[in-house]
Amino acid sequence: MKDFDTIAAISTVLGEGGISIIRISGDKSLAIVNKLFKAKNGKDILDMKPYTMKYGHIIEQDTKNILDEVLISYMKAPRSFTAEDTVEINCHGGVTPTKKIFQEVIKAGVRVAEPGEFTKRAFLNGRIDLTQAEAVIDIIRSKTELSMKSAVSQSIGKVSEEINVLRENLIETIAHIEATVDYPEEDLEEITSSQVQEKIEKIIEELERLLDTSEEGKIIREGLDVVIVGKPNVGKSSLLNALLSEKRAIVTEIPGTTRDVIEEYINLDGIPIKIIDTAGIRETEDLVEKIGVERSKEKINEADLVILVLDSSNKLNDEDYEIIEYIKDKKYITLLNKSDLESKINKSDLEDLKLYNIIEISAKMGFGLEDLKEYIKDLFFKGDIQTDSIIITNTRHKEALIRAKESCNTALKALENTLAIDLASIDIKNAWLSLGEITGDTLEEDIIDKIFSEFCLGK
């Protein structure tokens, strides 16, 4: 275990609640808290048994007044989250008592932890690898049960297991090649170019299998940005309200009622989807509405999917044509809204405009919403969403897998010349190094620091 100073942070959200937790980690954590804590039985906590709790009070050192009634828990190294001695103070929830106790802890000789520093110590002390560390923040940020399940799978080492098997196969191959090249006089089983090629091809197959999950995995982790667009008063806000099953957007007969972007999340069979209702796109002299239109265009450019809403009870006009032209290069679904009314849109017109993925709906009556949801899933997922197998959800992991695959392919090219078997080992080692970046075994320190800096305080 590495030699670190003692750190502390408030691990729960500041606000009113049942309890707040202040976490202290480091070899001085128990001694520091002992200065502030007075147990109900009058004993200090230096002889406290690990994995137990003690009841008492935190005492303000300057005034000797009781600050709060608390429970102290103690986890002894290396069997703690950070693999260091760790003490947690459980006090009453609330901003004032939590801050006052935290101030006393810092005054007693503890450094304020940086964002993600507890998890970083768990990684540096060897309790978890980098994929497991990243999974911690993914669990915290998960928006659906499916995204949480995927993050939990990563947190218990499922991704690491697959990566480590691949790395082990690569390093064994390197060892065989180098032994054959460096010690030809020894009585060693010689590895041939074709044998190495067969091993590398199998590894490439495994890399491709993992990479095939990455697009769906990214969506499970980060969700989809879905933008609703259309001219004013075609039913965009009604669609948003119908998808949310609540009245989130104002619905009136007055064009331009939605003047800004409205964003809400929905859970689509475990997929977190951010639905973005935009201001109607049209030419306007109203300054506020004009700003809303510009924001709408920005959201369209950033979107994973655009839902184009057309009013089927009215003929298409220049405003519709302008929007259709603007989104033609995006992935989109066309909704013919107000299907409960007589349709005045000619299907042949839609064919001429090369519009596709057309669904008839009535946002007001609720018709066609399930068809829309199924269409979204079909556009981004190949069949049913698999939750039991390993899914690559992290872009950093995907990029490392791509580099590993490229190195393996370069090794195969080198092996086409049977005399260049030793040259292939260089590329195989590069693949091994790339996979090590995923688990953190071969990653640069500054990149590791950047990853943990994105964590929240207290974690």
Curated annotation (Swiss-Prot):
Listed EC numbers: 3.6.-.-
Annotated GTP binding sites: 233-238, 252-258, 277-280
List of residues binding (6S)-5-formyl-5,6,7,8-tetrahydrofolate: R23, E88, R127, K459
Protein name: tRNA modification GTPase MnmE
Residues binding K(+), per UniProt: N233, T252, I254, T257
Lineage of producing organism: Bacteria, Bacillati, Bacillota, Clostridia, Eubacteriales
Compartment list: Cytoplasm
Boundaries of every TrmE-type G domain copy: 223-381
